[in-house]
Amino acid sequence: MIQFGIAPIGWTNDDMPELGGDITFEQCVSEMALAGYAGCEVGNKFPVNNLPLLKYQLELRKLQICNQWFSFELTKKPFHQVKNDFEKHIQFLHFFDAKVSGGAECGNTIHGNPNISLGDRKPASAEEWSLLTTGLNELGRFSIEEYGIKLSYHHHIGTMVESDEEVERLMNETHPEYVSLNYDCGHFALANEDSVGAFEKYHNRINHIHLKDKIGRASCRERV
């Protein structure tokens, strides 16, 4: 059964907290529930350091956590450090009975640097690809075997896995039992890729979907 959730970025922005900074956590999740969503992702207003309180607030509104972003830094940090952080992330999701863990490699992302444009993104090296895919396979195996949570990789604009070619390489070099795809039609469109074609191409690896409103609008890159 397909269930629909929503990300709190529609209320508050994690990268630019001043956007929606006046909106409370309670307002955010109440409006999610009133809109009819079954679940949500996790934002910066969520009381993640008080799990009983967070669980109570979500259960009160019949919401469940469906995913939480994780910034992998397998190309930048020692694997044991990434795994330690990842396990804490997985334990949080497990507490809420979530089945999916999303995120992307951020060790070489252009995000956070306003002086670098999307067109200045540098392709990853062979060594970086090896670090990423080997690390994802191990983290995905650990996550599913120890906690029953599937690693769902989010192809993301401005990161080393952005284009269809890069997504295809990631899928080819990771184990299908350990690494799935968090499909995002908006990020494929912004990368000038065929969103529908990509969905058809990778449908057997997709276990989590991010939907974006882009139909009938001008080119994403032109708008940006």
Residue ranges and their predicted role:
Residues 48-63, 67-69:
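Aromatic-lined substrate-binding rim segments of carbohydrate-active enzymes
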Residues 10-24, 43, 71-83, 121-130:
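Active-site mouth loops of central-metabolism enzymes
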